[in-house]
Each structure stands twice: as C-alpha cells, then as structure tokens.
Amino acid sequence: MPYNISVVKGRSYCPSCNKQIRWFDNIPLLSYIILKAKCRDCSANIESKYFIVELVSALSFVFIFYLFGFTSTTILFFILSISFLIIIFIDLKHFIIPNEITYTLIAIGFLKSFDPTLNQYLFPNYINSLIGGGVGYSIIWIIIFVYKKLRNKEGMGLGDAKLLSALGFWFGWISIPFILFFSSIVALGFALPSLMNKSKTMSSQIPFGPYLVLGCVLYLLLLEQIILYLN
C-alpha cells in the first residue's frame, strides 16, 4: 500500500497526533458524526473520505445482501466492493493501483471459476475466466504500447491492465468490451468539463482505475439487459 501500513495488523491512529483511536471512537459512521469530524485528542479534522467509504460500504453491503441473501455470491461481492473502494481512493490520491489488491482479485476470480454452483451468467467457468484475464490485460497493454509509440510518453499504467485483467478473471472475456465502453464514457463525462474550463489539459494525469471500477459496476447493473440483447 502507498504508506506501507498494514490494514490487518495494528490499531487505527490519528495521522495528526499519532494517538491510537479508542474503540468507541472507531465505530463506523457513528463516531464520525458524534465527534463532529474531529479527533478527540488533538481536534484535527477527520477527512470526509473515511465517512464516505463507510457509508458507501454499508449501502453496498445492504444492496448486495438484498439481492443475494446468505450465499457465496454475497461474500464474493462483499470482497469485490471493498476492493473497489480501496482502488478508487488510492488511485485518485496516489495514481497507483496496489498489486496486493489486483493480484488478490485475480486469484479469487480464477479460483471461484471452478465452483459449478455459482451463477454461470454472472461468473464464468475457468476457461472463460482465463481468457477474460488475458484479454483484459492485453487490451490495456496494447493501448499503452501504441500511445507510447505515438506520443513518446507513458499514458495508462500497468495497474490499469492488471485491474482490467482481474475483472476479466471475475466476469469473463465478454465483460471486457462493455466495461471498457462504460468506463470510457464515464471518464469522458468527468474529463470534458475540466478540459473545457482548461483546469486540465490533454496531457494531464488522470487515474483510470476509478473509471474501470464504475464501468464494471454499470456492466453488472445492466447485465440482465446485456444478456437479453446478446441473445
């Protein structure tokens, strides 16, 4: 991770005063509201991103559980939604997508493809999964290669290639063109206003990971319509 801080071991602490956060000040959503977004010890402001992550996580979990109930699919989507949130906030701030996240998603995506009890429309078999992973990585790699040849500088990063590969492992090769299309449309929608008011230029660095995530979410939300269209 960017700060080389374990998210598994150790307790949370305030980045301003380095004091450990008490358990009753670490309750998702409630603590942020009760403390009025300030550290109890040093009164430093607590970034709103923590509240946003907790809120989106809670809403995602409720929505996923509503759709799938007590099933292995629910657990898989819990893992995916947490990973998506981590990717979005890290890529937006640091312009990187941690290998720890993408490699874990690739491993889970491939291993779950051997489970015949999972919905085959949602999760592909291992052959489809393997092809999806390869196609996802190859497409971004080709884009990077061509852009560098034409512009003589880096465009997208290999982190994006690994992320699209992971999504291919999860949802198969058929998902790749839809995810790329949706993510490109969303990215264009966000980038155009900045380009028009000249706060960004065509050479500005733009993290594409969050748009791949949003593209994947749109693909999943529209999956039923996509299947009907393809059939």
Cite the ranges covered by each PLM segment.
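Functional transmembrane core segments of multi-pass inner-membrane proteins
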Residues: 79, 86-186, 229-231
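Select subsegments of transmembrane alpha-helices in polytopic membrane proteins
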Residues: 48-55, 101
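Hydrophobic transmembrane alpha-helices of multi-pass small-molecule transporters
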Residues: 58, 113, 164, 188-195, ...
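C-terminal ends of transmembrane helices
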Residues: 1, 36-44, 84-96, 141-153, ...
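Interfacial loop-to-transmembrane junctions
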Residues: 157-159, 192-218
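Membrane-proximal soluble regions of multi-pass membrane proteins
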Residues: 1-49
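Transmembrane helix-loop-helix
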Residues: 64-76
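Juxtamembrane boundary at the C-terminal end of a transmembrane helix
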Residues: 221-231
